[in-house]
């Protein structure tokens, strides 16, 4: 029961449980439904809440953002404000800096403008101040510009010639290309017709290309012409190919075009060398380019290898045979022919080449055509300094650039030629070497007009027009004709005795006037002779200078017989004399003709010609009392020596290092010893007025005085009429001599001459050489120098001990002569010394030959007055000095003695050599001279010019020679002569008398020479240790210094 109950209970429980379960299910459904609704509502609320919350959050965040943005904006605004403030400050600073800069720029601009103005003003001031001083510099700049222009013109001419040649070559090439193209077309057609005969064509091609046995011609390697040739040939081949393409068809395609390279042809399968008869091989061998090149080569050879004879025949041939012109025969051609005939080594080598023109063969000379210049003309007026050179106009100079440093020929109206060298002097082209001889031969004077016409082969035709505007067809001085000798003999005929004496001595020698004597082309002779013609009178003495030129135109000497002049050698060739028709040669005869009441003729003969007299004898003859002719024969021992003659203060030029004796006097038909001779004639005792006493020694250590003289020509035409005038008395002669001396003071020249030591116990006369014009009263009568001619000594010496000499500068009246003149005063010294006719003695004049060299330091003449004269000679040799002192008792001057300053006159003698310890000086005892050996003490002496310390500067060249030279002290230049205080242009005269403009600076930092010093040092070969001495020349017009150089 319990179990049932229990079972029932379980069931009930289950039922209740199920019921409860159903209830719960229903409740749960209800709850679910309610929950669903609630959930729906809660979901909606939750969404709304969420939205609200989100909105609220957004609002809050937006508010927060707004607050943050505001704060950030505030911060940003503050930052921007700061930035703006900074930018504003920076902008203000920039503006202020820009303003400051602008102000500084304006100030700088103002300062720059002021500086530029100041610089311009300073530059203008310097230009104004240095314009006068820099004239030489401006001339040099002009010369440089002219050189630059000449170079430009020459370059332009060369470029123009090159262009013309290129144009001609291109035109010839075009013509040849056209002709070759036409010939090529015909050759192509013929070749196609005959292509079966390949071997024959090959042989013909080989003959065409190589000739018979000639090497293949080279191809034109110029890329421009090669390209042009290919283009032309391609065009012509294309034109011809279009015409022949229709007929030939496939055969044309087999040919190789011109533009095919060798590499492309070699890429073919077959070997072209083995297939000699193939079309390709034939085409290669018969290419038109090769044939065209051969033809071009032939044409060029034809143009270049035409014989000159055929050329002249072609150019000068006309229809009329009479009008045929031959090539002119000029001196240059003749000289070239002689040169080729004389030397086998200078023969022109000719190369013969055979040029095939059709079937003919011509032999041609290998060389270029000689260009012939067209004839042109120019004229020149003869102005100052025309004796040495003549400048050619700059416009004409470029056309003569090929003749620079070559010889040309000047042909005058008489058909005579002179050989002259064209040289560049100071940047300009000029007639230089040989021009002086041309001037002297044709007597060209200042103011005349010369017309030059250039003809081919370096020849100029010269026409001379005088001052009267008329052409001079004949010239007074002729170079080697018989007519000139006849004219000379008509004017100055010698007496019968003199002619017989002359003919007797020289009858075996050839006539010295017969051969032609052209300047520069001297004929060779077996026996050289020198003859000098001059006319000397008691009133007038004309000493003509000799202006001659040797074969090389290097050596020229000045000769004069009596008067103030010199006797010297002119070289080993025949020379032309300016005073008449004479030929001068070395080792020769000096003949001086005189036509006067009492005239003297000095004949210096060679030992070979003089057989009638001894070495030391003098032969004098007098044909009549009215006209006495004195012959003095002097043996020169085959070489004329430096002879010092005392007649009218003469000097001489040495020919060699041997001694010659000259003694002149007036006894009749007597032989007089060279030492001394006195005789009574017509109640008076007459002694030779001139003598030369040699100074000898056992070892022949002797002293030699070097003398040079230059002459100034007096252009007065009244001198010629005085030659034929009557001879006045002695008093009249003195008056005329005084007037003549006053006239010659205007045209005086500095002269280097001998200081003659004269010693007279009987108060007679003393001869002092060194002045340009002197008048003496001698026993034979007063001899005065009347007419001088400038002796232009140009070039090197032909013989020993003769250096190059240039003419001195002409001194004006009132100028002081310093350096190589005889006296220092306001005018040249004019000494007129009187001697008693009844008692005269031989004047001892030193003739000193040379063995070893040294330099004369100074020669002074102190107390040159009427009461006493001292002559001191100081010779310096390696620290030793030879001092010769001669004292003289009162003199008797009869004329003006010249102006002197103070009691001393300083004399400078250039190039005096000394080496002797004992001198042999003759002395007079009882009317006869005896020679005695007088020892001369070697005393130390300073090398300086006396009384010229304020006008000289001596220094030693430094160890290094540069473009500039620093001087130990300032040069003696007065402020009045300066163009500017600190710098100036100074003229330096070297020992050869050449002028050198040099820039001189005188500043606290530097004193010395800059521009111009280097060429001066190079030309004079200055070395370290040489001593230079600058002596100021007393010339107010320019700053000039004579430079004496002592080698170390």
Curated annotation (Swiss-Prot):
Q: GO terms for CC?
A: nucleus
Q: Does the keyword Transcription apply?
A: yes
**What CDD domains does the annotation carry?**
B3_DNA (cd10017)
Q: What is its main location?
A: nucleus
InterPro entries found in the cross-reference section: B3_DNA-bd, DNA-bd_pseudobarrel_sf, REM16-like
Q: Which residues bind DNA?
A: 375-468, 953-1048
| Compartment(s) of residence | Nucleus
Q: Where is this region: Disordered?
A: 1-345, 505-528
Query: What GO molecular function terms would the record report?
Result: DNA binding
- UniProt lists compositionally biased (Basic and acidic residues) regions at 26-134, 151-162, 169-214, 243-253, 281-295, 332-345
Q: Where is the composition biased (Basic residues)?
A: 16-25
* Keywords, in A-Z order: DNA-binding, Nucleus, Repeat, Transcription, Transcription regulation
- Any keyword Transcription regulation? yes
Q: What is this protein called?
A: B3 domain-containing protein Os02g0598200
């Amino acid at each position: 029961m319990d179990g049932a109950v229990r079972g029932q209970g379980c069931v009930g429980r289950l039922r209740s449980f199920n019921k409860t379960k159903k209830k719960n299910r229903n409740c749960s459904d209800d709850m679910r439904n309610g929950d669903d609704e609630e959930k729906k509502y809660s979901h909606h609320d939750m969404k709304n809440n969420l939205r609200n919350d989100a909105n609220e959050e957004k609002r809050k965040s937006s508010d927060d953002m707004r607050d943050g943005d505001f704060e950030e904006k505030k911060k940003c605004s503050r930052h921007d404000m700061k930035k703006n403030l900074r930018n504003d400050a920076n902008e203000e600073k920039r503006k202020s800096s820009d303003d400051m800069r602008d102000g500084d720029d304006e100030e700088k601009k103002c300062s720059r403008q002021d500086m530029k103005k100041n610089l311009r003003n300073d530059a203008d001031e310097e230009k104004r101040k240095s314009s006068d001083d820099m004239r030489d510099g401006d001339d040099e700049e002009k010369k440089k510009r002219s050189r630059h222009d000449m170079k430009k013109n020459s370059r332009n001419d060369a470029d123009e010639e090159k262009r013309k040649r290129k144009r001609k070559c291109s035109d010839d090439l075009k013509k040849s290309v056209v002709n070759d193209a036409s010939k090529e077309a015909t050759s192509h057609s013929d070749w196609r017709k005959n292509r079966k005969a390949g071997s024959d064509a090959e042989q013909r091609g080989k003959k065409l290309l190589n000739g018979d046995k000639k090497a293949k011609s080279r191809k034109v390697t110029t890329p421009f012409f090669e390209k042009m040739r290919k283009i032309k040939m391609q065009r012509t081949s294309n034109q011809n190919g279009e015409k022949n393409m229709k007929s030939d068809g496939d055969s044309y395609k087999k040919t190789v075009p011109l533009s095919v390279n060798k590499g492309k042809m070699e890429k073919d399968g077959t070997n072209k060398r083995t297939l000699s008869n193939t079309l390709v091989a034939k085409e290669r061998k018969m290419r038109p380019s090769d044939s065209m090149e051969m033809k071009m080569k032939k044409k060029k050879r034809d143009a270049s290898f035409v014989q000159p004879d055929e050329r002249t025949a072609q150019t000068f041939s006309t229809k009329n045979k009479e009008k045929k012109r031959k090539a002119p025969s000029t001196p240059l051609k003749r000289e070239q022919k002689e040169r080729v005939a004389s030397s086998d080594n200078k023969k022109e080598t000719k190369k013969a080449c055979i040029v095939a023109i059709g079937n003919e063969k011509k032999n041609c000379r290998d060389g270029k055509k000689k260009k012939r210049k067209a004839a042109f003309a120019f004229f020149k007026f003869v102005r100052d300094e025309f004796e040495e050179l003549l400048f050619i106009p700059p416009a004409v100079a470029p056309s003569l650039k090929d003749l620079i440093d070559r010889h040309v020929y000047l042909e005058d109206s008489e058909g005579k030629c002179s050989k002259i060298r064209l040289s560049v002097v100071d940047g300009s082209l000029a007639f230089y070497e040989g021009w002086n001889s041309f001037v002297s031969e044709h007597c060209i004077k200042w103011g005349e007009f010369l017309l030059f016409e250039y003809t081919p082969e370096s020849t100029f035709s010269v026409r001379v027009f005088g001052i009267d505007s008329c052409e001079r067809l004949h010239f007074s001085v002729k170079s080697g004709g018989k007519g000139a000798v006849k004219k000379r003999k008509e004017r100055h005929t010698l007496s019968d005795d003199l002619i017989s004496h002359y003919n007797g001595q020289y009858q075996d020698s050839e006539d010295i006037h017969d051969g032609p004597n052209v300047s520069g082309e001297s004929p060779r002779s077996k026996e050289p002779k020198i003859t000098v013609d001059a006319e000397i009178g008691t009133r007038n003495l004309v000493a003509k200078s000799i202006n001659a030129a040797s074969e090389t135109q290097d050596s020229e000497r000045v000769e004069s017989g009596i008067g103030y002049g010199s006797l010297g050698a002119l070289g080993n060739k025949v020379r032309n004399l300016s005073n008449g028709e004479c030929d001068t040669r070395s080792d020769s005869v000096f003949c001086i003709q005189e036509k006067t009441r009492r005239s003297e003729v000095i004949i210096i003969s060679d030992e070979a010609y003089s057989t009638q007299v001894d070495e030391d004898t003098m032969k004098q003859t007098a044909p009549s009392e009215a006209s006495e002719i004195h012959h003095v024969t002097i043996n020169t021992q085959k070489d004329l020596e430096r002879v010092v003659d005392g007649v009218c203060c003469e000097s001489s030029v040495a020919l060699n290092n041997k001694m010659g004796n000259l003694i002149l006097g007036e006894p009749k038909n007597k032989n007089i010893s060279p030492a001394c001779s006195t005789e009574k004639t017509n109640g008076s005792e007459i002694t030779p007025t001139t003598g030369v006493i040699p100074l000898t020694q056992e070892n022949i250590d002797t002293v030699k005085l070097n003398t040079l003289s230059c002459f100034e020509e007096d252009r007065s035409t009244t001198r010629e009429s005085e030659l034929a005038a009557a001879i006045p008395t002695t008093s009249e002669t003195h008056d005329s001599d005084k007037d003549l001396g006053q006239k010659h003071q205007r045209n005086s020249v500095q002269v280097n001459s001998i200081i003659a030591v004269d010693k007279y116990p009987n108060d007679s006369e003393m001869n002092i050489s060194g002045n340009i014009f002197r008048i003496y009263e001698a026993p034979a009568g007063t001899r005065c120098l009347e007419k001088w001619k400038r002796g232009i000594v140009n070039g090197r010496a032909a013989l020993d001990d003769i250096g190059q000499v240039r003419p001195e500068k002409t001194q004006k009246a009132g100028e002081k002569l310093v350096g190589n003149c005889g006296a220092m005063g306001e005018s040249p010294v004019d000494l007129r010394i009187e001697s008693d006719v009844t008692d005269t003695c031989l004047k001892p004049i030193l003739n000193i030959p040379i063995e070893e060299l040294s330099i004369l330091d100074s020669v002074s003449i102190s107390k040159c007055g009427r009461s006493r004269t001292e002559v001191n000679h100081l010779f310096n040799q390696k620290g030793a000095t030879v001092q010769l002192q001669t004292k003289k008792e009162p003199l008797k001057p009869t004329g003006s003695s010249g102006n002197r300053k103070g009691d001393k006159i300083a004399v400078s003698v250039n190039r005096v050599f000394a080496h002797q310890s004992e001198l042999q000086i003759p002395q007079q005892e009882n009317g006869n001279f005896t020679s005695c050996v007088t020892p001369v003490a070697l005393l130390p002496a300073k090398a300086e010019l006396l009384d010229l310390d304020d006008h000289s500067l001596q220094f030693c060249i430094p160890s290094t020679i540069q473009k500039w030279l620093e001087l130990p002290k300032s040069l003696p230049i007065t402020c009045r002569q300066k163009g500017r205080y600190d710098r100036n242009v100074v003229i330096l005269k070297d020992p050869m008398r050449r002028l050198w403009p040099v820039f001189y600076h005188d500043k606290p930092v530097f004193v010395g020479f800059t521009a111009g010093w280097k060429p001066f040092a190079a030309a004079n070969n200055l070395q370290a240790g040489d001593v230079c001495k600058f002596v100021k020349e007393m010339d107010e017009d320019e700053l000039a210094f004579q430079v004496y150089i002592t080698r170390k």
